């Protein structure tokens, strides 16, 4: 009889939990946390700092103007053809040399974000709210992974990839990628900035056995990923904290991460290699004193989220971005922007190819292109990564 009573109580508790679980989670999900951002250098034009924006992106040539919605990332193949994702779940290919002709290369679904070619010519993509996908040269779409190991302390199942964002591929074929937040799907990515909880993670997918492993956890919106030129480490962006980290794959620091750039005036997005041994980084937006102040007052943000309609919330300034070049040590080399915001206000990606830089933006309706002064006119990403393998 006692056992029967215990079972009845357990069932009752379980039913009440299932019925009210959403209320508990909603209470948690509207609870922003405290963050004190460090002081930063000015990005104002003419300020004389390494971050001072110019107007270089404003005069970039437009590719696919009016044909595209949301080319978050861009990439080029060995034939100089240009690829990007769209918010309609498509991978679009623009044909070289003038990029005036295009086609839907593949329909993946979701929102294709980060892109990378592997050694076999497969186009690998982080697809928002869906997972990591591969598109073969024959356009066959294959899901690689959609989950990782669940955290032991999680109330909600966080094994599913909610916002897979960017990726890069090591020489051994392993795919390193970010899942920006455990709390929001890709279409609600900006809401993560309001709470600013450290739930972003860095993961690795091994094609040899199909396994997915979480390498790092507890970052504020992990974003861009880029293998270092020597492949002994990788860089990844922590957007809401305005930092760039290096994760070591080899050597005495293997398995450990260190911050190489901190307290930037902009929110970092994708990172890619440059032909001169340095790296390109996109800024999706710029810090403001008002939003920085709000991060120190989580109660205010909680009241805002509960009492105001979303179109009246205070969000980060994602209407002004840019492109930054930095070196192995994290020193800033140059910064470029679109001061008027007419062509490339928000930049989420850039890709160097044969002396030109191609610009993508998740809220944009075009891809930008301009010549890079002093760049190697023969350098390409596929050749730098895979040499004569393909």
Q: Model features per residue range: what roles?
A:
Residues 177-197, 284-317, 369:
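Short, conserved, GDST-rich strand-edge loop motifs in beta-rich repeat architectures
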Residues 126-192, 199-200:
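Asp-box/WD-like beta-propeller blade repeats and closely related beta-sheet repeat scaffolds
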